[in-house]
Amino acid sequence: MPTPWTLLERAVTPDGVLELRARGERDLMISHDGRVLMSSRIHRSELAVAELGCAPIADRKAPRVLIGGLGLGFSLRAALDALPATAKVTVAELNPVVVRWCEGPAAIVTQGAVKDRRVRVVIDDVTRCIRAAASGKEKPYDAIILDLYVGPIDGRNAHRHPLYGDAITAAAHAALSEGGVYAVWGEDRSRSFEQRLERAGFASRFVLARGGGPRHAVYVAEKKKAATTRGRSSRRREGGTV
């Protein structure tokens, strides 16, 4: 008989009810209003979005990385493993309870990633952090990684979406250094989001991440020099699986 899940903590937040459950010491999951958001057993896509986002800029002298969404900390752990000791990583997380979980019972599955000296966690909306860099209030980032509860979607008003619409996608482009990378996790492929990346000036590719669970989408978009994108489409129709 399978070991039952134990409820470790339940938190009512402005976004809904978050629950942390455990089955043994290293088998953890976070749910939102009863829907499983992340699991310590199935997290290949979380690793992939961070690995793909950090790989192109990992050899920079002191790369600056912004991660939107903490979850169980797997994307943060993957980013830290890919980046040099000189890197500075800012994690924007809306819910303080999630940070506390990652510092406490969930720390074991990421070797205490949130307490790494390269990491700064802010309780804030990641779009505010993006806009601060886009406006020059903060230094530009070398990589921006979004690993949030929901990914890009298609639909009538998708271009106005606060996380993946035209305005914030353009802001992400402005918030990046030259050659910087915008890596975004998604549940499914969104053709309209790919078009928004193109309109913002990114050269992008779409990758399927799979490993012990359903395939999820990872968008890897690079900010190109103006001279290399002028006069031709900046969109790359590459694909792949990781």
For each feature predicted by the language model, list its residue ranges.
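C-terminal lobe and adjacent flexible extensions of AdoMet/dcAdoMet transferase-like proteins
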Residues: 219-242
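The AdoMet/dcAdoMet-binding core of the Class I SAM-like
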Residues: 43-176, 184-185, 200, 205, ...
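Short alpha-helix
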Residues: 188-200
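Residues that form or flank phosphate/diphosphate-binding pockets in enzymes
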Residues: 40, 74, 192
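N-terminal auxiliary segments of SAM/dcSAM-dependent transferases
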Residues: 1-31
